[in-house]
UniProtKB/Swiss-Prot annotation:
This is Vacuolar membrane protease. Glycans are attached at N158, N256, N774. The chain crosses the membrane at residues 70-90, 405-425, 467-487, 498-518, 540-560, 566-586, 652-672, 693-713, 720-740. GO terms for biological process: proteolysis. It is found in: Vacuole membrane. Belongs to the peptidase M28 family. Residues 1-69, 426-466, 519-539, 587-651, 714-719 are cytoplasmic. Pfam families: Peptidase_M28, PFF1_C, PFF1_TM. It comes from Laccaria bicolor (strain S238N-H82 / ATCC MYA-4686) (Bicoloured deceiver). Zn(2+) 1 binds at H195, D207, E265.
Length: 1019
């Protein structure tokens, strides 16, 4: 601005006659009244401009390019946001596997993956044995050729453990590999864990086939590159049935050799694996870019797991729980949860394919090398070592202690406001000292009445409050939009999370920028016009600082009371805005001070009344005028917009760029990364019963936090952005409210189970013990009722899915709210599609001998299990149970919980830290490594209300998971269907679901068994 004035001063020096001919002055007093008069130009004799006209033209363009003006500000803000969003998106893409695979063999791993995931292979299936044998065949040659590699095919470990409400007895079939370290002290080994069982409804490519084949590669690698510490590989079985394989590992002697673990898991359908959870800072250091080429980690995922936002469980919970108390890492896939535990968790449907597998292998190798060979940091253990961690565009990992974050936050809460107040006061004092008229006297102040008439108090009040008004409007409109999504199409975020974010962000931009750019009309001097945008920006910077200070206060409380580490971005944001405010105060000390006395305006004699154009046109006109060299016919000052700038076109060169770089890139990058993680992991948890409002609130909060950093610069953003965001909001929101939310790529998940009620054939007899009665459930008890139950989201389940199933046609549908999966309903109906347990009937010979006729064979096909129940004491009982072609049975105690149970032949006592609690156990889950195993369970209960001697009632049940389409021979040669003899297991109702579900829906399991057959008992 001053450079332009200097240019015209030089021009008038060379042609002073033109001044008198073509110019006159207009004086404006303090009340805004104008007085016009003619005047001669100042005496410029002897003054020479140090710049030539050509140089002046170059210098004049500097404010246009880097000044705090509309075009430069808009361009830089857009470039900043687009660069950050592009980085977040592009760095999340999976790169092609390198040719140099650092001792790993991706091709072999992919071959292993296809073998392991050829069929669903849950613990209670025949194909589970085939997978076990295949893995064993892969590791045995390694142990045979290397002296420090040892294998344990664990067929002996068993135990009992309890969780709130239920108890477990489990017999493990884990495959353990030990690689002796070069300098291990005996108990500082590292555990590598993955599970080779899948759920009954999925082949398990990502859950957890990729984890298993990664461990196979690490075994080969560390056998050739012996580590410093001992490595234990637990390729366990039974994780899907509530983490049983990890519990079984704790029963093995090798569990005493480890104090750190790396667990590989899959909670989705591929993509890039993330460090989901970590116990302490020391193991997280293994994820630094020195070891892991593309670290992907964020502590917010750990916060989400801890608070039940993501309903899932991994072996991490066992390894960190009572009895183990190890420190370690949980690495898992998280994208595409709609395919999790479904038929789409298969090799052909994996998100990323070989690239996804390589990402897991590369991550595990890097972290494993660090854990086995890097120096330990024992000081990190304990509460002081709780970590805060996040990656920066998959290139670097930032790690620090949660306690350090707390200390820094507390200091910032105190030092920040005090220092800022000091700088602002200094700015005010210095500006008042400089605010004097040319004669040195203080500037005259208008009277109170004049001040009120001028409404400058109203302008000042609006300038200092409009940020908060805009924020309140934004929050209200965001809440209204959340309600709109919940009311019109609550599942639209399921398949279009990023469109939902665009909708929220567009609205946030509009609701913030429109109030902030509203101003009162006022008459300003050229100097005031010059500094007005800067003062506006400074005011908004302070408002944003106050906003981040409030966020920092709540963040500090969350860190101190709830150990929430995911709010680290607030700390970074507050620090950046604080520094920007300090610099703004320094800038304010240097800005020209608008004078309160008469102000002079210049007008051309030929254009006394000049109408200002719109801001963008004004800037373009200036550029054209500055490109034209002056001549004698060139219009004088009246045609130069330099002295008639609108307030929006003022601004100091350079300062605003520093402010922008301090306040926008860091918080926007951190928030964008966090928002991307939330939008990739949360939306499809709606099918699991997660509240929809939580997902939309997360998207809304992300959008608002992304928009707030640009508010100090809102006055200089081009009006075209308003129309762009307005149109995008209308179009995107309308589409999302009308679009069908599911597709074959993002199917809605429903949960299946069939229940078979057996006839209660009980024979009464008297026991020699206290004359108490006993009962027997005969193996030939007939099927009394078969009920098919499907769980899912209420509207689509009742109106779009169940009506498509032939077996449900014309049947009475009974629906109830699901307690285990809140937000979902279970609808059931009686079915004529009767399942068959398959296998060989273990009681066929006994039944034929008892009946003395061949006809018993046909009746034996109805057999499911055999059970005997006896009262062995006042508060004691015994159940003998044998299921047909199954490894899994259950005991339900409906009338009262039991306080103790013991399984004959099992490990004595309960696992340390997992004893039956005070509330007792209403259910006991029994798992054996062999089929047709006879369980003998002794149990005790407490009397209620002193009613000693009363018995107990409940149900005896067994589970089945195999169905024909899941066991088809695919020619891989891995499994002989008839190895156990007998018939094939059949679940025709599940086959019906697979055949008749719409293409936008997919089936998963409700619980451990797809079929549960049960019969009541009392004792």
């Amino acid at each position: 601005m001053f450079l332009e004035i200097n240019f015209y001063s030089t021009f008038f020096q060379r042609r002073p006659s033109l001044w008198k001919e073509r110019c006159k002055f207009e004086e404006v007093d303090a009340q805004g009244n104008s007085i016009s008069y003619s005047h001669h130009p100042p005496d410029l004799t002897g003054q020479r401009s140090p710049l030539t006209p050509t140089t002046m033209r170059i210098v004049d363009r500097i404010p246009t390019v880097v000044g705090f003006r509309v075009i430069p500000t808009t361009v830089l803000v857009l470039l900043t946001y687009l660069t950050i969003f592009t980085l977040v998106i592009v760095t999340d893409w999976l790169p092609e596997p390198p040719k140099n695979q650092n001792g790993l063999d991706l091709k072999q791993a992919y071959t292993d993956l296809r073998h392991i995931t050829a069929h669903p292979h849950p613990y209670n299936s025949h194909y589970n044995d085939a997978v076990h044998d295949y893995i064993l065949s892969r590791v045995r040659p390694v142990a045979a050729s290397t002296s420090f590699v040892h294998i344990s095919d664990d067929q002996t470990s068993n135990g009992s453990w309890a969780s709130p409400g239920y108890g477990v007895y489990f017999e493990g079939t884990n495959i353990l590999v030990k690689i002796d370290g070069k300098s291990s002290n005996g108990n500082d080994g590292v555990l590598f864990s993955a599970h080779y069982d899948s759920v009954s409804t999925a082949p398990g490519a990502t859950d957890d086939g990729m984890g298993v084949v990664t461990l196979l590669q690490l075994i080969d690698y560390f056998a050739k590159h012996r580590p410093d510490r001992t490595a234990i590989f637990n390729i366990n079985n039974g994780e899907e049935d509530w983490l049983n394989g990890a519990h079984a590992f704790l029963q093995h002697t090798w569990s005493n050799l480890t104090d750190t673990f790396l667990n590989l898991e899959g909670a989705a359908a591929g993509g890039r694996p993330i460090l989901f959870r970590a116990t302490s800072t020391s193991p997280v250091r293994a994820f630094r870019s020195d070891y892991v080429p593309h670290p992907h980690a964020n502590v917010i995922s750990s916060d989400a797991f801890a608070r039940g936002v993501i309903r899932s469980g991994t072996d991490y919970e066992v390894y960190t729980g009572a009895g183990a108390e190890m420190e370690g890492l949980d690495v898992a896939f998280y994208k595409g949860r709609s395919r999790y535990h479904t038929k789409y968790d298969a090799v052909p449907y994996t998100n990323g394919g070989e690239r996804s597998l390589w990402a897991m292998m590369e991550t595990a190798q890097g972290a494993g090398n660090a854990l086995l060979n890097a120096k330990r940091h024992k000081q990190d253990q304990g509460s002081g070592g709780t970590p805060v961690y996040f990656d920066l565009v998959k290139a670097e990992l930032v790690i620090f202690y949660l306690n350090d974050l707390l200390i820094y936050n507390v200091v910032s809460l105190v030092v920040g406001p005090i220092s800022l107040i000091f700088f602002v006061v200094c700015e005010y004092v210095l500006r008042n000292e400089r605010a004097r008229q040319p004669n040195g006297h203080p500037v005259s102040r208008p009277s109170v009445l004049e001040w009120l008439k001028q409404r400058s108090w109203l302008r000042a009040l609006w300038r200092r409050s409009k940020f908060w008004i805009a924020l309140v409007i934004t929050i209200a409109l965001q809440a209204l939009l959340v309600w709109g999504y919940l009311a019109f199409n609550s599942f639209t975020v399921y398949s279009s999370p990023y469109l939902v974010l665009i909708s929220f962000f567009s609205l946030a931009y509009l609701s913030l920028v429109i109030p902030l750019t509203f101003t009162f009309n006022q008459t300003q001097s050229p100097t005031a016009k010059y500094i007005a945008p800067e003062r506006e920006k400074h005011t908004l910077l302070i408002q944003v600082y106050i906003f981040t200070w409030i966020l920092l206060l709540f963040s500090t409380i969350a860190v101190a009371r709830a150990q929430v580490g995911g709010l680290y971005f607030v700390t970074a944001w507050n620090t950046g805005v604080w520094i920007a405010c300090l610099l703004a105060a320094v800038e304010g000390m240097m800005l020209p001070v608008p004078q309160g006395g008469p102000r002079v305006r210049f007008h051309s004699a030929h254009h006394h009344h000049h109408h200002e154009h719109e801001e963008d046109q004004d800037a373009d006109d200036d550029d054209r005028e500055q490109r034209q060299p002056p001549t004698e016919a060139t219009p004088l000052i009246g045609y130069s917009r330099a002295s008639l700038r609108k307030p929006q076109e003022g601004g100091v060169v350079g300062w605003w760029i520093v402010h922008l770089l301090l306040t926008i890139p860091a918080p926007v990058l951190l928030i964008a990364q966090m928002g991307s993680l939330l939008l990739d992991s949360l939306p499809q948890t709606l099918a699991d019963g997660s509240p929809a409002y939580v997902v939309y609130a997360a998207a809304s909060l992300t959008a608002v936090l992304l928009a707030v950093p640009l508010t100090p610069f809102s006055g200089k953003l081009h009006r075209g952005l308003f129309f762009l965001f307005f149109l995008s909001f209308l179009i995107v929101t309308a589409y999302l409210w009308l679009a069908f939310p599911f597709s074959s790529a993002d199917p809605l998940k429903v949960f299946f189970q069939q229940k078979v009620t057996l006839s209660n054939v009980v024979s009464e007899r008297h026991s020699s013990i206290m004359g108490l009665s006993n009962s027997t459930v005969h193996p030939t008890a007939g099927v009394r009722k078969v009920v098919t139950a499907i769980t899912g989201t209420p509207y689509y389940l009742k109106n779009e899915i169940i009506p498509r199933l032939p077996s449900a046609s014309g049947k009475e549908l009974k629906c109830r709210d699901e307690k285990a999966k809140r937000g979902l309903v279970t609808c059931e109906w009686e079915s004529t599609l009767v399942p068959s347990p398959g296998g060989r009937n273990p009681w066929e010979d006994d039944f034929a001998a008892a009946q003395g006729r061949v006809g018993a064979t046909s009746k034996s096909r109805q057999s499911w299990f055999k059970a005997e129940v006896a009262r062995t004491g006042v508060r004691k009982g015994q159940i003998v149970l044998q299921g047909r072609n199954t490894r899994s049975c259950r005991l339900y105690f409906d009338s009262r919980p039991i306080i103790k149970y013991v399984v004959e032949g099992g490990h004595e006592g309960m696992q340390k830290g997992y004893e039956v609690g005070k509330v007792g156990a209403s259910e006991v889950r029994l798992w054996s490594r062999t089929r047709d195993r006879e369980f003998v369970v002794d149990f005790e209960w407490e009397d209620d209300d002193g009613r000693e001697g009363e018995g107990i009632t409940g149900r005896i049940a067994c589970e089945w998971v195999e169905y024909e389409s899941g066991n088809l021979d695919n020619g891989d040669g891995q499994w002989d269907l008839q190895r156990g003899g007998g018939e094939r297991a059949k679940i025709p109702a599940f086959e019906e679901v697979l055949a008749f579900l719409p293409e936008w829906a997919v089936a998963s399991k409700t619980t451990d068994g797809l079929v549960e057959a049960w019969s009541p008992f009392s004792v």
